[in-house]
């Protein structure tokens, strides 16, 4: 089955074709980051307009790369939530209209299920059950995965997501959007012996929930103190970026290890935009070796929003009997736990 995947939940237009027999055939990603950077974040109206403008041309490019015609597609999968309503509507409308014209099924896919399954596109794959850390600008969750659609939430952020905390911290020291890659780049110039240290929120108590608002406040306090004392130079910013990144990474690693031990599992996947962070990957690999556990992740280009993960997730549900929806349905908010389980046939 050859499935066209459309991802338009936020500020990336991702298009891909996944073949259940031959794997990923082609993919393209168009990022709107440059347009939104001047506003310091995503502007929903601009995002939806750009998805409308770019989706059809990208579909043509992906078909050409795969050496296919539209008539050779067997199904279309599109992101139907969670995300920005206008952006979701753009992709869903195009996807369903094209499917109707071709006489093939169209299936709405959960954005975070796409992220969760993205590491399955790689040669090295975990076997279910495993623990998933979903970490992005909008989500920070630990989930036990027993099968496709068999998800149990173990913990989540009670306030800011990790990616959102990176964005806000970056803005405090004058770095552009998106903040995660900017903080990571600047942190490489930081001095680990600067004396700056930020809290690892909620790691001193039981449980698997996260909170990053206090860490963000501690960072802001340090920045204001540096400004008041005329110390907020480039080296201070680099030191602060390193201390902040280290605090976020340590918090995520501690909770991941705790989740694996609590559930008696030895496999972890990390997915979502923050999973591309090199320090996070290195620390997870180092710490999980101590408990003889393994970590899996997607290649960097599939950590951020992309069509490949949507095509793959849609294909898994379609080949295992899930039928296309009769009407257009998108959801700005959509808990993973509400997805139906799907046993492999």
Curated annotation (Swiss-Prot):
GO molecular function, one term: N(6)-L-threonylcarbamoyladenine synthase activity
Localisation: Cytoplasm
Keywords tagged on the record: Acyltransferase, Cytoplasm, Iron, Metal-binding, Transferase, tRNA processing
GO cellular component, one term: cytoplasm
NCBIfam families on file: gcp_kae1 (TIGR00329), T6A_TsaD_YgjD (TIGR03723)
GO biological process: tRNA threonylcarbamoyladenosine modification
Keyword Iron applies: yes
Family as reported in the entry's similarity comment: Belongs to the KAE1 / TsaD family.
Name of the gene this protein is made from: tsaD
Entry's cofactor comment: Binds 1 Fe(2+) ion per subunit.
Protein residues bound to Fe cation: 111, 115, 305
Role this protein plays: Required for the formation of a threonylcarbamoyl group on adenosine at position 37 (t(6)A37) in tRNAs that read codons beginning with adenine. Is involved in the transfer of the threonylcarbamoyl moiety of threonylcarbamoyl-AMP (TC-AMP) to the N6 group of A37, together with TsaE and TsaB. TsaD likely plays a direct catalytic role in this reaction.
Catalyzed reactions per annotation: L-threonylcarbamoyladenylate + adenosine(37) in tRNA = N(6)-L-threonylcarbamoyladenosine(37) in tRNA + AMP + H(+)
Binding positions for substrate per the UniProt entry: 134-138, 167, 180, 277
Organism, scientific name: Marinomonas sp. (strain MWYL1)
Documented EC number(s): 2.3.1.234
InterPro entries according to UniProt: ATPase_NBD, Gcp-like_dom, KAE1/TsaD, Peptidase_M22_CS, TsaD
Protein name: tRNA N6-adenosine threonylcarbamoyltransferase
Cofactors, names only: Fe(2+)
